[in-house]
Amino acid sequence: MAFYGSSALRILYGLNRFSEDLDFSLLSKEKNFNLTPFNNAIIKELKGFGFEATMDTKIKNFDSNIESAFIKADSKKQLIIIDALHNIITSTHKMQIIKIKMEVDTNPPRSFDTETKFLFQPIPFSIKSLTLPDLFAGKIHTLLCRAWTIRVKGHDWYDFVWYLSNNIPVNLQHLKARLIQSNAWDKQLHFNKIELINLLAQKITITDFAKANEDISLFIKNTESMAVWSKEFFIAILATLQTIN
């Protein structure tokens, strides 16, 4: 199993914004994978650090490659445990529940690499993660395929800028595999940097970046860098996109 998604990018690689879910991927397809047997071990580990929580596996109403579960805990109590600032504790309602969504991809697209990362908090430990070019491929797949029926996900575009500003190339083979799996690309067709830029340009032209700005403001402290966001800005920075096969 490997860590991926925006939380992996924040925790392991220094993305400077808040994130929501904990996303993991199996290393190969496992149709019968079930998160439930892991619930007790996760709750026991959290309790070892003083956190009292419950974990419920989501019952799927339709066939899906994603296994989901929610870790739930009393928000105010956990803030006291971690010695949060007094004003944060007092402003938190005593009945407020914190929910952390955990998802596992049980049928990951091929053509990705992993690496081992080491962290020191809360204790020294290692964790397997998708590499940055593969994480970037996953983010672009999300940008191209996410169904924005409620709001524009500005944090996706924020991450896109982060990858470009850090000169991270996108793994084209992994991205192609993801697009094919989502029925967003014909596996018989060639896929290269030109096709990718065309797809991104099409997405940019139909994106409301004013709404994207509203969304990202929930995830970052300083919004000044988003003042430049516009269709023209994102079209221009496509020229800096790097790829690997």
Locations of regions flagged by a protein language model:
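Structured mid-to-C-terminal alpha-helical surface segments
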Residues: 1, 12-15, 27-245
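Glycine-rich beta-strand-to-loop/alpha-helix junction loops that act as flexible
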Residues: 4-7
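Anion-coordinating catalytic cores for phosphoryl-, nucleotidyl-, and glycosidic chemistry
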Residues: 19
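Structural signature of FAD isoalloxazine-binding scaffolds in flavoprotein oxidoreductases
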Residues: 22-24
